[in-house]
Amino acid sequence: MVTYKDSGVNIEEGYKSVKLMKEYSAQTFIPGVLNGLGSFAGMFELGKYKNPVLVSGTDGVGTKLKIAFEMKIYDTVGIDCVAMCVNDILCHGAKPLFFLDYLACSNLEAEVAAELVKGISKGCMDAGCALIGGETAEMPGFYSKGEYDMAGFAVGVVEKDNIINGSTVEEGDVLVGIASSGVHSNGYSLVRKLVDNFQVDFFGSALGEVLLTPTRIYVKPVLKLLEKFKIKAMAHITGGGFYENIPRMFKEDFTAVIDKNSFEMPEIFKYIMDLGVDEEHMYNTYNMGIGFVLCVDSKDAPDIIKDLNEMGEKAYIIGHVKRREKRVCLK
């Protein structure tokens, strides 16, 4: 008799992984969660809003996963998966409510899958949202043995009158940059082309470990700011770096004039540049030390930076807005 296991799908390992995942996801539950992992669908009660708008985002971790497999460090990329989604919906003023994940692999290893979900749960707790569902797909022959792919889906809510869309941006507004934790989750295909050995020493740690530093989650500090200040537009600096992401927060034709010397560039970016990547390409690929940008009235900028610093975030005035064509000008 031929069984499903003979084809490469281990149902028992799947049951084991779900049991481990449930323990981690339960730690993320917040008011509004009506059920958790194991049901056919996750349910969340919206609660009291006057005119709620649901805001959704989906993303993955990309080839950063390749380094995780090589280093055998699996939990940090789960945080990345959450960060990439919740930081995006935050750009429109949304508070993340719940998260779902998708894991795909050739042959399921319960402990590895559980470590990935452990990281996702940590990311959800950092963002204040609940992990209420997901899918783990075991597909023999589709992926290389020992490798996983990962994607996430975040849903948040914002009152309709409070949606942030860049419509109030004016010439003279100031750009506040919040520091990144490193490379975050973009540009890893380029890094992997340049680097052969991820075990090499980098300021006392293995380079691979430094590259696996999780993407910073900006949800809690930015939501705190929104209680006190009018933030006109926000940008999450992901793939495409400064050049692609900063113009996305403007509805009209504005130029973001950025002072490259106004913020600290982490050593990891200097290292990548030394491997042969020119500066313009770096700013068109990486966050260069700024993971999130706020567009605010110039009079509010000093207090916003003060509040961010008090919340443990490094923040800088990195530039200003001029009415010109929609682009970024680095000085």
Swiss-Prot record:
<keyword id="KW-0963">Cytoplasm</keyword>
<dbReference type="GO" id="GO:0005524">
    <property type="term" value="F:ATP binding"/>
</dbReference>
<dbReference type="InterPro" id="IPR036921">
    <property type="entry name" value="PurM-like_N_sf"/>
</dbReference>
<comment type="pathway">
    <text>Purine metabolism; IMP biosynthesis via de novo pathway; 5-amino-1-(5-phospho-D-ribosyl)imidazole from N(2)-formyl-N(1)-(5-phospho-D-ribosyl)glycinamide: step 2/2.</text>
</comment>
<comment type="similarity">
    <text>Belongs to the AIR synthase family.</text>
</comment>
<dbReference type="GO" id="GO:0046084">
    <property type="term" value="P:adenine biosynthetic process"/>
</dbReference>
<dbReference type="InterPro" id="IPR004733">
    <property type="entry name" value="PurM_cligase"/>
</dbReference>
<dbReference type="InterPro" id="IPR016188">
    <property type="entry name" value="PurM-like_N"/>
</dbReference>
<dbReference type="InterPro" id="IPR036676">
    <property type="entry name" value="PurM-like_C_sf"/>
</dbReference>
<dbReference type="Pfam" id="PF02769">
    <property type="entry name" value="AIRS_C"/>
</dbReference>
<dbReference type="GO" id="GO:0004641">
    <property type="term" value="F:phosphoribosylformylglycinamidine cyclo-ligase activity"/>
</dbReference>
<keyword id="KW-0547">Nucleotide-binding</keyword>
<dbReference type="Pfam" id="PF00586">
    <property type="entry name" value="AIRS"/>
</dbReference>
<dbReference type="GO" id="GO:0005829">
    <property type="term" value="C:cytosol"/>
</dbReference>
<dbReference type="GO" id="GO:0004637">
    <property type="term" value="F:phosphoribosylamine-glycine ligase activity"/>
</dbReference>
<keyword id="KW-0067">ATP-binding</keyword>
<keyword id="KW-0436">Ligase</keyword>
<dbReference type="GO" id="GO:0006189">
    <property type="term" value="P:'de novo' IMP biosynthetic process"/>
</dbReference>
<keyword id="KW-0658">Purine biosynthesis</keyword>
<dbReference type="InterPro" id="IPR010918">
    <property type="entry name" value="PurM-like_C_dom"/>
</dbReference>
<protein>
    <recommendedName>
        <fullName>Phosphoribosylformylglycinamidine cyclo-ligase</fullName>
        <ecNumber>6.3.3.1</ecNumber>
    </recommendedName>
</protein>
